[in-house]
């Protein structure tokens, strides 16, 4: 493996949006880059675990670079197709595009009921969906980690610089305000502590999974979103070297909230159920 991993060191075959629109079957708009965005990785893993084949699709317009992340209208083709401009998006046959985690999970369950990733018990199911929302939903763990990074970056980057422009684009996407940036750290810590407590209760019941005795969607989302705290090592997750520092946590208070249970769980879920090394 190269010491430096580039943004474009991809292995999957990504088709253009125009090509994808003419295809049938399942297409996942992921973006052709080596960044383990937790929403995209969770979406990929749902369909991988169920053995559902899919076509990987670029985010950017034909001829545009993925590094712009939608700036200057470079996601206009995606917007025209899916009525929004972010990845991941799951499109099955001629059905409507699904751009939210819950719609993607429900689609995966419908296309391949087994292995079942949603508990049958009503109370357990409601509990699981609530916890996934705390991880992947708006104002959840991933959302607040982005707000936390945006807040730090905008305070340190020189106005007009490339870094400031990049983070300003993300700030608009995540509805950033100074007040939200200030509150993000406490929210991250709260969610991490709650998830850690959930895992400890599961261990007391003799299970290594969040709910019940088998893999659920919650295990997948927790494992994938832990990358925002501590990515898997390069040999297992060959992400762009320039992005790895931003994914690593450097805050001591958040570090304390991370504990060890969530990391151990992430490693177990990837080792036993998900694709390693991660393929971009």
State where each predicted segment sits.
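GST-like domain detector, emphasizing the conserved glutathione-binding G-site
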Residues: 1-164, 273-277
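Conserved aromatic-histidine-acidic binding/catalytic patches
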Residues: 28-35, 92-96, 120, 176-187, ...
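Amphipathic alpha-helical segments that form well-ordered structural scaffolds
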Residues: 42, 46, 187-198, 265-269
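Charged, glycine/proline-rich intrinsically disordered loops and linkers
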Residues: 63-69, 160-169, 239-255
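Generic alpha-helical structural signal
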Residues: 102-105, 129, 189-193, 263
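GST-like fold's C-terminal all-alpha helical module
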Residues: 130, 137-242
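Short His-centered aromatic/hydrophobic patch
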Residues: 225-276
């Amino acid at each position: 493996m190269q010491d430096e991993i580039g943004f474009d060191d991809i292995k999957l075959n990504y088709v253009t949006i125009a090509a994808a629109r003419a295809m049938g079957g399942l297409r996942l708009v992921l973006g052709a880059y080596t960044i383990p965005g937790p929403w995209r990785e969770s979406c990929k893993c749902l369909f991988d675990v169920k053995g559902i084949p899919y076509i990987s699709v670029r985010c950017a317009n034909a001829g545009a670079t993925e590094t712009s992340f939608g700036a200057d209208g470079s996601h206009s083709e995606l917007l025209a197709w899916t009525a929004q401009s972010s990845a991941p998006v799951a499109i099955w046959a001629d059905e409507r595009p699904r751009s939210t985690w819950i719609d993607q999970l429900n689609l995966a369950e419908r296309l391949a009921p087994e292995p079942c990733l949603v508990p049958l018990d009503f109370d357990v199911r409601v509990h699981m969906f609530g916890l996934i929302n705390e991880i992947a939903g708006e104002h959840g763990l991933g959302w607040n980690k982005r707000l936390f990074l945006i807040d730090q970056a905008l305070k340190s980057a020189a106005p007009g610089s490339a870094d400031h422009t990049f983070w300003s684009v993300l700030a608009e996407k995540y509805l950033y305000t100074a007040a939200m940036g200030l509150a993000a750290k406490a929210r991250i810590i709260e969610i991490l502590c709650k998830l850690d407590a959930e895992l400890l209760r599961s261990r007391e019941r003799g299970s290594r999974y969040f709910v019940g005795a088998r893999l659920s969607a919650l295990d997948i989302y927790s494992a994938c979103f832990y990358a925002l705290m501590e990515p898997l090592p390069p040999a297992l997750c060959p992400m762009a070297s320039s992005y790895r520092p931003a994914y690593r946590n450097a805050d001591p208070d958040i570090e304390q909230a991370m504990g060890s249970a969530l990391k151990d769980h992430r490693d177990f879920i990837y080792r036993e159920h998900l694709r390693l090394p991660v393929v971009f």
